[in-house]
């Protein structure tokens, strides 16, 4: 959420933060109308507060005169009537100011974050900037199959029966695919906790609406989540939501920053707006597993932490020997709450394309302001932390990448060396 007070101040460049934020919205391809409405409403709110304070001061002054008049035996009825009028005015003005304040808050909740200055300006994924390529895209002497063809041929993925029991965008993993999914989760969690020092966490798989508001999913993306009817509970779209809200409305000690967590969870998404996209296979499911990295960082260190977090996600791909690239998203392709995002895209030979397998973002204080997560230095005032998170990795898409990159001409699939100890020493998948 944006800092309304900051919008009224001058930036170090000499321009106002309002102008900078407005330009940030333009760079995102977002409307600036709401920002302008916020400024007008905030101006109105201040005027109403001033009027209420003036009326209150007059009321207090007259109230003081009433006692004097009564002590002198005079008639204070006229002043009493005037005080009653002022009391009514104060209540009305304060109510209008509170209403304007709520309107400002409601509007502020639907404005996206301001992009960091290092983010390239662009309108779509074609304007994203390739940062690096790791590994050579896998090429075969035979026609590469897509993962769903391999999964069905090996009898380890069943989409048809999932469609019968549940519906579209679901799958049964069985045999070697189920074993590999479980092995990947364990492998990723071990790597992040044992090598990189993240604290393991398994969060609740349901959250309340306040938590979704804190991360920026609500109110703008309410249609993207599954709601448990008759309650204030929602299935999580990502572990980012419960883990970010772990410190909701708390003040941390500066010396305890950064705090880093790795969390496994299933994720549930309605995929509203994705009609016709990736309708076959595991790429876009209503339910999928993911390992998430989450860091609460000092504002002075957050962009340094962002680089480290992204490299930790990359390490999983390198250990599995999967070709990938890192892409810096442009302003028009970033998520709503992000100030800067790197996507990791893994090579899929069956599609002959790079596909997203991880998104690593620095939200700066955008989420912390919404969820009221702060830290305090010794003797200092509370400040908002910076929050960062990244998929490390989307487990189903990692399974997809292994099937497609390790496929063989005879229809079998090899298992990455790093994963073999997690699969009982198994080296391949055959029917």
From Swiss-Prot:
Family recorded in the similarity comment: Belongs to the class-II aminoacyl-tRNA synthetase family. Type-1 seryl-tRNA synthetase subfamily.
Note on domains (UniProt): Consists of two distinct domains, a catalytic core and a N-terminal extension that is involved in tRNA binding.
Residues involved in L-serine binding: 238-240, 292, 391
UniProt-listed PANTHER family: SERINE--TRNA LIGASE, SERYL-TRNA SYNTHETASE
The keyword RNA-binding belongs to this UniProt entry's keyword annotation: no
Gene transcribed to yield this protein: serS
InterPro entries named among the record's database cross-references: aa-tRNA-synt_IIb, aa-tRNA-synth_II, aa-tRNA-synth_II/BPL/LPL, Ser-tRNA-ligase_type_1, Ser-tRNA-synth_1_N, SerRS_1_N_sf, SerRS_core, tRNA-bd_arm
UniProt keyword Protein biosynthesis present: yes
Protein's cellular compartments: Cytoplasm
GO molecular-function term, one example from the UniProt record: ATP binding
Annotated GO CC locations: cytoplasm
Chemical reaction(s) catalysed: tRNA(Ser) + L-serine + ATP = L-seryl-tRNA(Ser) + AMP + diphosphate + H(+); tRNA(Sec) + L-serine + ATP = L-seryl-tRNA(Sec) + AMP + diphosphate + H(+)
Pfam family, one: Seryl_tRNA_N
Single GO BP term: selenocysteine biosynthetic process
Coarse class of the protein's main subcellular location: cytoplasm
Residues at which ATP binds: 269-271, 356-359
Record-linked PROSITE patterns: AA_TRNA_LIGASE_II (PS50862)
Name this polypeptide is given: Serine--tRNA ligase
Complex and partners: Homodimer. The tRNA molecule binds across the dimer.
Keywords: Aminoacyl-tRNA synthetase, ATP-binding, Cytoplasm, Ligase, Nucleotide-binding, Protein biosynthesis
Coiled-coil ranges per UniProt: none
């Amino acid at each position: 959420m944006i800092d309304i007070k900051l919008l009224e101040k001058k930036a170090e460049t000499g321009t106002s933060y309002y102008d900078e934020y407005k330009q940030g919205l333009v760079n995102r391809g977002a409307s600036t109308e709401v920002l302008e409405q916020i400024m007008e409403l905030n101006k109105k709110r201040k005027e109403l507060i001033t009027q209420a304070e003036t009326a209150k001061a007059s009321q207090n002054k007259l109230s003081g005169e009433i006692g004097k008049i009564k002590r002198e035996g005079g008639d204070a009825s006229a002043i009493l009537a005037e005080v009653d009028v002022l009391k009514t005015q104060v209540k009305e003005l304060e109510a209008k100011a509170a209403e304007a304040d709520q309107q400002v808050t409601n509007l502020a909740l639907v404005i996206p974050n301001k992009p960091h200055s290092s983010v390239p300006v662009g309108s779509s994924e074609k304007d994203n900037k390739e940062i690096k390529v790791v590994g050579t895209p896998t090429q075969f002497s035979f026609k590469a199959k897509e993962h769903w063809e391999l999964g069905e041929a090996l009898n380890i993925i069943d989409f048809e029966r999932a469609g019968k029991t549940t519906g579209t965008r679901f799958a049964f993993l069985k045999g070697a695919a189920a074993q590999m999914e479980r092995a990947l989760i364990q492998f990723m969690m071990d790597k992040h906790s044992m090598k990189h020092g993240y604290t393991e966490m398994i969060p609740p798989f349901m959250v309340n609406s306040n938590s979704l508001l804190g991360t920026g999913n609500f109110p703008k993306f309410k249609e993207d989540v599954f709601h448990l009817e008759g309650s204030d509970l929602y299935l999580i779209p990502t572990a980012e939501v419960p883990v970010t809200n772990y410190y909701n409305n708390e003040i941390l000690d500066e010396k305890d920053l950064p705090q880093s967590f790795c969390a496994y969870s299933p994720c549930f998404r309605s995929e509203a707006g994705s009609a016709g996209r990736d309708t076959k296979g595991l790429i876009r499911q209503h339910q999928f597993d993911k390992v998430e990295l989450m860091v609460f960082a000092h504002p002075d260190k957050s962009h340094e932490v962002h680089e480290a977090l992204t490299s930790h996600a990359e390490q999983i791909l390198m250990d599995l020997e999967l070709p990938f690239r890192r892409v810096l998203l442009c302003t028009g392709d970033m998520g709503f709450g992000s100030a800067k995002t790197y996507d990791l895209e893994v090579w899929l030979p069956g599609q002959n394309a790079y596909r997203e397998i991880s998104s690593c973002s620095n939200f700066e204080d955008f989420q912390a302001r919404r969820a009221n997560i702060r830290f305090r230095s010794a003797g200092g005032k509370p400040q908002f932390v910076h929050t960062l998170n990244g998929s490390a990795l989307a487990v189903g898409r990692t399974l997809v990448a292994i099937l497609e990159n390790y496929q063989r001409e005879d229809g079998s699939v090899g298992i990455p060396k790093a994963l073999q100890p997690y699969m009982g020493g198994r080296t391949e998948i055959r029917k």
